[in-house]
């Protein structure tokens, strides 16, 4: 048990360079592809290695613009909300219209809302 604790302590104290060398050894000699998160956790602040491609996006309605009625109808259709709920969402802007959407879906929703006159943001 003490050996594992000492090993864990050594692993936690590795520098970024040492972690990269360890990753290379694991990949080349043992065929193990280390997870990016494990490398980053013990990397000690290498922010560039922590960059991940975002896969879930939120479509935020910032304002309804001039044609509020068209935006309310579109929000109703896009979200499946009732007319009153869709109106409340539009009136309460900025609010999310869709959360956790794929990039393509978020872009499509944004395009539709902007064509209806709304101001939209993707986060």
From Swiss-Prot:
- Give a Gene Ontology cellular component term annotated to this protein: cytosolic large ribosomal subunit
Query: Single GO molecular-function term?
Result: structural constituent of ribosome
Coiled coil ranges (UniProt) are none
- For this entry, list what GO says about its biological process: translation
The record's keywords, sorted A to Z, are: Ribonucleoprotein, Ribosomal protein
- Read off the CDD domains from this record: Ribosomal_L7_L12
Q: Name one Pfam family in it.
A: Ribosomal_L12
Recorded family membership: Belongs to the bacterial ribosomal protein bL12 family.
Q: HAMAP family, alphabetically?
A: Ribosomal_bL12
Chain's role? Forms part of the ribosomal stalk which helps the ribosome interact with GTP-bound translation factors. Is thus essential for accurate translation.
Q: Which NCBIfam families match?
A: L12 (TIGR00855)
What is the protein's quaternary organization? Homodimer. Part of the ribosomal stalk of the 50S ribosomal subunit. Forms a multimeric L10(L12)X complex, where L10 forms an elongated spine to which 2 to 4 L12 dimers bind in a sequential fashion. Binds GTP-bound translation factors.
What's the protein here called? Answer: Large ribosomal subunit protein bL12
The opening ranks of the lineage are: Bacteria, Pseudomonadati, Bacteroidota, Cytophagia, Cytophagales
Gene coding for it = rplL
């Amino acid at each position: 048990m003490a050996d594992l604790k000492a090993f864990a302590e050594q692993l936690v104290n590795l520098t970024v360079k040492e972690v990269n060398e360890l990753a290379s050894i694991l990949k080349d000699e043992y065929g193990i592809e280390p997870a990016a998160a494990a490398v980053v956790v013990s990397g000690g602040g290498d922010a560039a290695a922590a960059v991940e491609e975002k896969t879930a996006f939120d479509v935020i309605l910032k304002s309804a613009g001039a044609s509020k009625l068209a935006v309310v109808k579109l929000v109703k259709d896009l979200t499946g909300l009732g007319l009153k709920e869709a109106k409340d969402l539009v009136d309460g802007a900025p609010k999310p219209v869709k959360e956790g959407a794929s990039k393509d879906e978020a872009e499509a929703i944004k395009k539709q809302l902007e064509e209806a006159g709304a101001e939209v943001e993707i986060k």
